[in-house]
C-alpha cells in the first residue's frame, strides 16, 4: 500500500504482553467513550487486534455527516485518535494524545463500509508515535499520525475505572 504522509512502520508487540490477534478491545474503555464501547450515543466501533495493528470495519452513519453525503472531518479525527489510543494499550502503555495530525486525502462518504487501522510506529521513553488510516478497497481516504504521552500503568484506573483489568491481559 502506498502512503502519502505516514511510513507504515509497525512496532512488534511484546509476546509477553498478553495481547493477541483477534482480541476485541472495546471493553477496556469506559461507557462514556464517544467512539467505541457500549455507549448508545457513541459510534459503537468494535476494534480488535489484527497483525500487530488495531483494526475495525465501520460504516459512518448519516448523523456523522458534515458536507452533503460526507463524514465530518472531526468525526474522522476522533475515530483515528481513539484507534491510535487503543494501539498504545496493546503495547501495555496507557497514554494520552499530545499531538495529532490528520491528512484528508479523498472525501469519505457516509453509509459506506471502511477499514480503520492504527498501530504504534515507535516508542521513545514516554513518547509513543502512532499512525492510522481509513481506507475502502485499496484507496486511502485519511491518514493520521500522533504522538502520545505514556502516563504509566497507574493510569489504568482512568481508562477503565469499573473494569477488572487483570481479566483483559494487562
Residue spans for each PLM region:
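Hydrophobic beta-strand-centered segment that forms part of the acyl-chain substrate-binding groove
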Residues: 82-115
Amino acid at each position: 500500500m502506498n502512503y502519502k504522509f505516514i511510513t507504515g512502520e509497525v512496532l512488534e508487540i511484546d509476546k509477553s504482553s498478553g495481547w493477541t490477534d483477534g482480541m476485541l478491545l472495546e471493553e477496556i474503555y469506559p461507557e462514556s467513550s464517544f467512539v467505541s464501547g457500549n455507549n448508545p450515543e457513541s459510534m459503537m466501533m468494535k476494534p480488535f487486534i489484527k497483525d500487530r495493528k488495531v483494526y475495525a470495519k465501520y460504516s459512518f452513519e448519516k448523523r456523522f455527516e458534515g458536507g452533503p453525503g460526507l463524514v465530518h472531518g472531526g468525526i474522522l479525527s476522533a475515530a483515528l485518535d481513539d484507534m491510535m489510543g487503543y494501539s498504545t494499550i496493546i503495547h501495555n502503555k496507557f497514554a494520552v494524545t499530545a499531538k495529532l495530525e490528520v491528512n484528508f486525502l479523498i472525501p469519505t462518504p457516509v453509509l459506506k463500509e471502511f477499514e480503520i487501522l492504527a498501530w504504534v510506529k515507535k516508542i521513545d521513553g514516554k513518547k509513543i508515535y502512532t499512525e492510522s488510516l481509513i481506507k475502502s478497497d485499496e484507496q486511502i481516504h485519511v491518514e493520521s499520525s500522533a504522538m502520545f504521552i505514556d502516563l504509566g500503568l497507574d493510569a489504568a484506573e482512568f481508562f477503565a475505572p469499573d473494569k477488572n483489568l487483570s481479566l483483559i491481559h494487562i
